[in-house]
């Protein structure tokens, strides 16, 4: 849901951040001669996107009257770095300064402003420019804040839900939805100061098919991303029709092909099995012929062997019996 206070808050931050977008500082040699009207101390919060160039300006004081210019840089967790320029000797001096990306914008006698070539998260901190002149001291103080654009992802979830995520942004991104839904947001802070925001929303209304996730951040403005919702039971039915039915049809086709192959193989084997009895019958023919031919011999041999065994007992009845057997 879009909230007015969130939108206003973003707008205010953008206005504060305009200063960081300046590419040049006022010409110190064209400032008013009456420096008494200049504020002695100015505090400014500066927002710079990571990877961009930052330019921090000293007070608009005529350099012809400058005695000493000093930049004091206090980064988180580090000792203060001091960069100074002495006008009478034109000497520069550095103390506890190791970051080579932080330098003078030009030669100090022409432009004592400070520049950071590529802003990183470790450059967050306090930057102070002090200018000493015969009339007093003037100071510009900057609280430098680094902006990190988040990586945005969005995707549909289950049961008519949608997820929108802004990963590792600084400051934390704001996420809203159109139309409104039942939403839950979760923030996860990281050790480097960035924040991941994850918003999950659910819509009961079946007529809502497309929703919009709006991600608001200082570096990117408002991004509107569309997400197509699933249709619950209709979606399951669609998945069933789309995936399951074609699979079943493919299985049926494969089964029919297998059955046709099996049936064809059986038909090919049937003539071979029908010819087998003929072969067996042909193989048995010689044995059958031999038996028929050998039976008379067997009978003759049996008769011949029976006659000698009966010769010692031949009498009237036995002779008739033997004669009958011989016939």
Swiss-Prot record:
CD200 and CD200R1 interact via their respective N-terminal Ig-like domains. Its main location: membrane. This is Cell surface glycoprotein CD200 receptor 1. Residues 26-145 form the Ig-like V-type domain. Residues 147-226 form the Ig-like C2-type domain. It is a single-pass type I membrane protein. InterPro entries: CD200R, CD80_C2-set, Ig-like_dom, Ig-like_dom_sf, Ig-like_fold, Ig_V-set. Phosphorylated on tyrosine residues. SUPFAM superfamilies: Immunoglobulin (SSF48726). Residues 24-239 are extracellular. Restricted to cells of the myeloid lineage. Inhibitory receptor for the CD200/OX2 cell surface glycoprotein. Limits inflammation by inhibiting the expression of pro-inflammatory molecules including TNF-alpha, interferons, and inducible nitric oxide synthase (iNOS) in response to selected stimuli. Disulfide bonds join 58-129, 81-97, 164-213, 183-201. Residues 1-23 form the signal peptide. Belongs to the CD200R family.
């Amino acid at each position: 849901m879009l909230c007015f206070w969130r939108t206003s808050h973003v707008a205010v931050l953008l206005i504060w951040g305009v200063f960081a977008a300046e590419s040049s500082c006022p010409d110190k040699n064209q400032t008013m001669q009456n420096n008494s009207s200049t504020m002695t101390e100015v505090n400014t919060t500066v927002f710079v996107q990571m990877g961009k160039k930052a330019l921090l300006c000293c007070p608009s004081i005529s350099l012809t009257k400058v005695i000493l210019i000093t930049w004091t840089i206090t980064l988180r967790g580090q000792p203060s770095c001091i960069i100074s320029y002495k006008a009478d000797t034109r000497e520069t001096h550095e103390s506890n300064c190791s970051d080579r990306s932080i330098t003078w914008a030009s030669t100090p006698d022409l432009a004592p402003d400070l520049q950071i070539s590529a802003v990183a998260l470790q450059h967050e901190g306090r930057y102070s420019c002090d200018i000493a002149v015969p009339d007093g001291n003037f100071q510009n103080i900057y609280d430098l804040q680094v902006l990190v654009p988040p990586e945005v992802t969005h995707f549909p979830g289950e049961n008519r839900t949608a997820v929108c995520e802004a990963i590792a942004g600084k400051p934390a991104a704001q996420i809203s939805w159109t139309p409104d839904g039942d939403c839950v947001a979760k923030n996860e802070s990281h050790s480097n100061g960035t924040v991941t925001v994850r918003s999950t929303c659910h819509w009961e209304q079946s007529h809502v098919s497309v929703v919009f996730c709006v991600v608001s951040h200082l570096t990117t403005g408002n991004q509107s991303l569309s997400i197509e919702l699933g249709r619950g039971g209709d979606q399951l039915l669609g998945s069933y029709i789309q995936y399951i039915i074609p699979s079943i049809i493919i299985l049926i086709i494969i089964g029919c092909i297998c059955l046709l192959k099996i049936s064809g193989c059986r038909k090919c084997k049937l003539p071979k099995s029908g010819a087998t009895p003929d072969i067996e019958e042909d193989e048995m023919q010689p044995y059958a012929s031999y038996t028929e031919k050998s039976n008379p011999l067997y009978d003759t041999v049996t008769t011949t062997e029976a006659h000698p065994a009966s010769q010692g007992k031949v009498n009237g009845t036995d002779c008739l019996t033997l004669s009958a057997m011989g016939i």
